[in-house]
UniProtKB/Swiss-Prot annotation:
Cofactor note: Binds 2 manganese ions per subunit.
Annotated binding of Mn(2+) 1, by residue: D267, E390, E430
MF annotations from Gene Ontology: manganese ion binding; metalloaminopeptidase activity
UniProt keyword annotation of Transcription present: no
EC numbers: 3.4.11.9
Keywords annotated in UniProt: Aminopeptidase, Hydrolase, Manganese, Metal-binding, Metalloprotease, Protease
Organism: Verticillium alfalfae (strain VaMs.102 / ATCC MYA-4576 / FGSC 10136) (Verticillium wilt of alfalfa)
GO biological process, one term: proteolysis
Pfam families: AMP_N, Peptidase_M24
Function, in words: Catalyzes the removal of a penultimate prolyl residue from the N-termini of peptides.
Transmembrane domains' residue ranges: none
Protein name: Probable Xaa-Pro aminopeptidase VDBG_02538
Highest taxon, organism lineage: Eukaryota
Length: 460
């Protein structure tokens, strides 16, 4: 049994998370007294239909409860540190169709919660806790039902709780890391299955079907995001969504896909040759991107400035594209002009957790510097944070052509050499890294060495 499987036999550490959030609020609001109040995602019907929308639990709620049930509420008493989960009571009409729901006793056994009551008791419990307390109810704006009353509380604060949870979510505990390892393990199985099938499949949607089937077969019914299965030049589209084009006549597939395990995401990208052998141009670009990733990973550790790691990746991209002749001129001048953004237009990576693009990254999408505008994490990395490292080089005519028309950039690009690379489409390699005090740990076991990929794909 894997170490992460042993950890996951325990309960999701909801009480520890609640106490961390409470301490954070006290640091922002000295002397804070009262309750934390959260609601899970409520059942919602599809438009013009009596069918419910696919359910996705609110991440703020899950962080303090570990509960994936719909229509639940939660209270944490700041004075006593007691947590109470409210679950839906038995609805006889619903039982006819859906069977018996979880009982309070079962919920208390399953979740790391002190008390479990039913949702028809929420207002009575709030009234009890607020009576004569002179305290504050901390909640999240626009996530409180109109039927919920905070009568008796001296104040209601809808400004602090959301940010407090987001800041606490940045640093993961062992259980959260174990969930991410599990998601990575399942996703790796799916990635490898697609690699094995790519030289016999007919189109992208076959590959997507294989990926989803492998995830589902291993218990991961939910994807962290809509996967990208992009063949040929479509790989130059960063978030390609069609996943339906034929594979015939194309060089490579870029697969960006990750399963979710108990609300925690994996986010993995691999690029591999459809024939089982990289073309000369594809291999050249792949080697540059792999170097970008490996050198970026080498410098990771607690306190590293993510902006600097992103810039390092650009410097390596420039060096590689100069060696190929796609770029020409002086490397420092090309970096200063930001011409490399034409080929590497996105950020090096982002925080990972319950959301694929997880909270706490403080990006600046208004940044006037195009090299940093789409960097989803700005600032230093703390130990315990999870980041993706996903450099890429792309040959997207829509992005590159404006650079070719701008003399500021066109003087650095050799169009005759560039023309040899359009069919490569794009290459991206993405792993999930745990930041430690002295370095990092790669949680993604998916193969990525080019010789190993060629052998793996070619042996199918």
């Amino acid at each position: 049994m894997s170490d992460y499987e042993t950890i996951l036999k325990g309960k999701y550490p909801a009480k520890d998370h609640a106490k961390r959030v409470a301490d954070h609020i006290r640091s922002k609001v000295p002397g804070a007294n009262g309750i934390l109040y959260l609601e899970g995602r409520h059942t919602k019907l599809e438009e013009d239909s009596d069918h419910p929308e696919p359910f996705r639990q609110r991440r703020y709620f899950f962080y303090l409860t570990g509960c994936i049930l719909a229509d639940c509420h939660y209270i944490f008493d700041l004075k006593t540190s007691q947590s109470t989960l409210f679950i839906p009571p038995v609805d006889p009409e619903d039982v006819i169709w859906s069977g018996m729901p979880m009982t309070a006793e079962e919920a208390k056994e399953k979740y790391d919660i002190d008390n479990v009551l039913y949702t028809n008791e929420v207002n009575a419990e709030l009234a009890r806790l607020g009576k004569g307390s002179g305290s504050t109810a901390f909640a999240i704006a626009n996530q409180v039902l109109d039927t919920v009353s905070f009568i008796g509380f001296e104040d209601k604060n809808f400004d602090v709780l959301k940010g407090a949870i987001e800041e606490c979510r940045v640093v993961k505990d062992d259980y959260e890391v174990a969930l991410t390892r599990k998601a990575n393990a399942i996703s790796t199985t799916a990635h490898h299955a697609v690699m094995k099938a790519v030289n016999t499949a007919k189109n992208e949607q076959e590959l997507e079907a294989i990926f989803l089937e492998r995830c589902f077969a291993h218990g991961a019914k939910n994807q962290a995001y809509h996967a990208i299965h992009a063949a040929g030049r479509a790989a130059a589209t960063l978030h390609y969504v069609h996943n339906s084009a034929p594979l015939d006549g194309k060089l490579n597939v870029l697969l960006d896909g990750g399963a979710e395990w108990d609300c925690y995401a994996s986010d993995i990208t691999r690029t591999f040759p459809i024939s089982g052998k990289f073309s000369k141009e594809s291999r050249a670009i792949y080697d540059i991107v792999l170097k970008m990733q490996l050198e970026s990973i080498k410098v990771l550790k607690e306190g590293i400035l993510w902006d600097d790691v992103h810039e390092l990746a650009h410097k390596i991209a420039i060096e590689g594209l100069l060696d190929l002749g796609i770029l020409k001129g002086e490397a420092d001048e090309i970096l200063k002009a930001r011409t490399s953004v034409a080929f590497f237009p996105h950020g090096l990576g982002h925080y990972l957790g319950m959301d694929t693009h997880d909270v706490g990254g403080t990006p600046n999408y208004a940044d006037s510097d195009p090299m940093f505008r789409y960097l989803r994490k700005r600032g230093t990395l703390p130990a315990g944070s999870l980041v993706t490292v996903e450099p890429g080089i792309y040959f997207c005519s829509f992005i590159i052509e404006p650079y070719l028309k701008d003399p500021t950039h066109s003087k650095y690009i050799d169009t005759d050499v560039l023309d040899k690379y359009w069919d490569v489409g794009g290459v991206r390699i993405e792993d999930n890294l745990l930041i430690t005090k002295t370095g990092s740990e790669n949680l993604t076991p998916t193969i990525k060495e080019p010789e190993e990929i060629e052998k793996f794909v070619g042996s199918s």
